[in-house]
Design a protein with these regions (language model features):
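Non-catalytic alpha/beta scaffold blocks inside enzyme catalytic domains
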Residues: 1-27, 32-177
Length: 177
């Protein structure tokens, strides 16, 4: 719901429907915003966002130490990286020269989609790993397109927005294997 060109309109509409029908503040009721990326919660839990560590921890010295000890990783990032919108602003300003996009379509899913597409043309190196051969981001000028497995070709777990973890087993062989 929220990662679309109309996301900023959809979410308040959902909230307003809940308010109008009295479905807020009662057990089992309330709005539940859906992300635009499968396993987005799983990515957050393992530290897949640039602005937080694993398990939704911030970058305080104590939290950095906790993650480093848990993972037995003496060298760990010590500060936030750029969020997606900030990253594309940095590309526009020439601060980022190379980008590797994996399994997402930021030329559609991010705010200011036209600015995102325009910034991609300023990269010296633009690599995409995806399971499709064409989408708006690829068509914006990817120089290298690498294959990636689709969800039915992967083995692992996914975590949905309510934090339910599901086992995922492949039911198709990846092309070329």
């Amino acid at each position: 719901v929220n990662q679309s060109a109309q996301g900023t309109d959809k979410v308040p509409s959902i909230i307003n429907c809940h308010l109008a029908t009295g479905r807020i503040g009662k057990p089992g009721m309330g709005p539940f915003s859906l992300t635009g990326q499968p396993n987005a919660m799983g990515g957050r839990e393992v530290g897949g966002l640039a602005n937080q560590l694993a398990a939704h921890m911030a970058f305080s010295p104590a939290e950095i130490d906790r993650v480093a000890r848990f993972w037995n990783a003496p060298k760990i990032v010590r500060r936030e990286g750029l969020k997606a919108v900030q990253m594309f602003d940095a590309i526009e300003r020439g601060k980022i020269k190379a980008l590797w996009v994996m399994g997402t379509n930021p030329a559609v899913s991010l705010p200011r989609a036209r600015a995102v597409r325009d910034s991609l043309s300023k990269l010296d190196l633009f690599v995409i790993s995806d399971n499709v051969i064409s989408n708006d981001t690829i068509d914006a000028g990817a120089q290298i397109l690498l294959p990636a497995c689709a969800w039915g070709e992967k083995d692992g777990t996914v975590t949905n927005s309510e934090r339910r973890i599901s086992r995922q087993r492949p039911f198709l062989k990846a092309p070329g294997e």
